[in-house]
Amino acid sequence: WRYGPRTPGDTSVVGWQLMALKSGHMAYLQVPPATIVGANKFLDSVMSDYAYYGYTDPGRGQATTAIGLLCRMYLGWKKDHPGVEKGIQYLSQTGPSAGNMYYNYYATQCMRHYEGEMWDKWNVKMRDSLVNSQGKNGHEKGSWHMKGDHGSERGGRLYCTSMATMILEVYYRH
């Protein structure tokens, strides 16, 4: 999947599509087996060192690695899978970002699904970071506006607030 028909896929769009398919599956909708095979084939094409993911080619991006790991978890990789263990270790060592809400969104979901001590530590850091960075005055009160990454800069306060809200509701999804 990508932004137009018949174009090579990218990890970002594949992530959104697989989250939608996961939600559909949880609502008892049938997901064609060929779709799962194709998603795994794409993820194989952008994976490097068995745990890291790039955007359209093998790589090691923070956000794309979090997306790739979450997709693999949704597609059946278990917590004890070597690729999941290695990827989760990488996310845990990297920790939450002060400005990259896209990475935080996917990494938080990965850590939540992984559970355990690494999730507990991640959750405290992420939650406290969001609470402490929330706007406190005037028209910004209750919102977020991080600086530093493409999405936060382009999307502004609305994007950051939306992503922060979805991060904080991770306890109630999937």
Feature annotation, model-predicted:
Residues W1-V37, D44-Q89, Q93-D128, N132-H174:
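An alpha-helical repeat/solenoid feature that recognizes helix-turn-helix modules
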